[in-house]
UniProtKB/Swiss-Prot annotation:
This is UDP-galactose transporter homolog 1. The keyword Translocase does not apply. May be involved in specific transport of UDP-Gal from the cytosol to the Golgi lumen. Involved in the maintenance of optimal conditions for the folding of secretory pathway proteins in the endoplasmic reticulum. It comes from Mycosarcoma maydis. The gene is HUT1. GO terms for biological process: UDP-galactose transmembrane transport; UDP-glucose transmembrane transport into endoplasmic reticulum. Its main location: endoplasmic reticulum. It holds the Pfam family UAA.
Amino acid sequence: MTLLQLGVCAGSIYTTFLIWGLLQERLTKTPYTAPATLLHPNPQPDYFRSPLFLNTVQALFSSVVACMYLLVRNRGSNKRVTQILGLHTLTPDGIAEKTQNGRASATNGKAAPTRSRWISPLLSRYILIAALQSTASQLGFLSLRYISYPTLTLAKSCKLVPVLVMNVVLYRRKFASYKYAVVGLVTLGIWLFMAFAPSKPGKKAKAPESSSLIGLVLCLLNLVLDGATNSTQDQVFSMFGRQTVSAGQMMLVMNAISAFLMALTLTLPIPLLSTPGQPTQLSTAIAFTQKHPEVWRDIIAYALAGAVGQVSIFETLERFGSLTLVSITVTRKLFTMLLSVVVYKHELSKLQWLGVAVVFAGIGIEAREKRREGLANKVIHDEKRALAKDA
């Protein structure tokens, strides 16, 4: 059952984020052209340059979808709406009561979270996660001003390493030895696949100087914050337990906080985020949507696809942890490109095929160990049931 659940989660992530990726490319790379008028018979194509606005709408949609998901999943339940949505645990008294009833400290082998007079320890971690994620996404977009998209993608392929490092450094977590092997194999394989892609005919190779030091520093900070985000999410599930916080509840609250933080940033005249003639990203986005109202169709579809995909992401995070989740997300690019090879008859270099083999070796180890863990848990469960019957 564990392996089947992992397959369902991975398949859902691949499907939804394949659609999400196509819409993201359309929004960021495809020009929008306004209808010709007497005053402007030959309108110039425009590009949507408000990534912070996109992320804000994405977070709002994700909050709504998470709320609907929780309510539908718990329909017929006797719980109050605040309990279903996990809102009652966001107060100091609520988290103390829930932790005590759920016996989080006994379940996870850790001391119960320290009770604060002013803020729930769970809410403080939600705020931290939202701030880390919001900042990381903006650093990624800013890095594209200085480095090429392939360079950023290549760096993102090594995301497993900072996630593993942050889990160990920040929260002193220990992993089974096979996890380190899987991280190494998948990272190496993805790097080989991305680094040795043959250059497309008719396109000149970019000089190494295009990847400036500023862009690489921003990219590195993006990876570090991504690793801190995933490891902190892991720590929340480990510290408070699934009886206290569920994947849907984390998705709801985290995205609501992210939407608030990013909406606030949208209204601030930050030089790095503004464009010529517009003091804020909000004014930039509003001006663009007024000129090209058809962009709303792509924005809404993009946000909806991302929100549905996040449900699968948070379920995977809750059930299997951040390392397995990031293994799925970083290999999504590889499977997408392999699909492109099959459909459009693209060619891969020998080193790329080696990278594919290395990644599949890592995935095979992960699947084998997950199956062993599932069988071991089944044996333990059967033994407990047998002992209960004898008693």
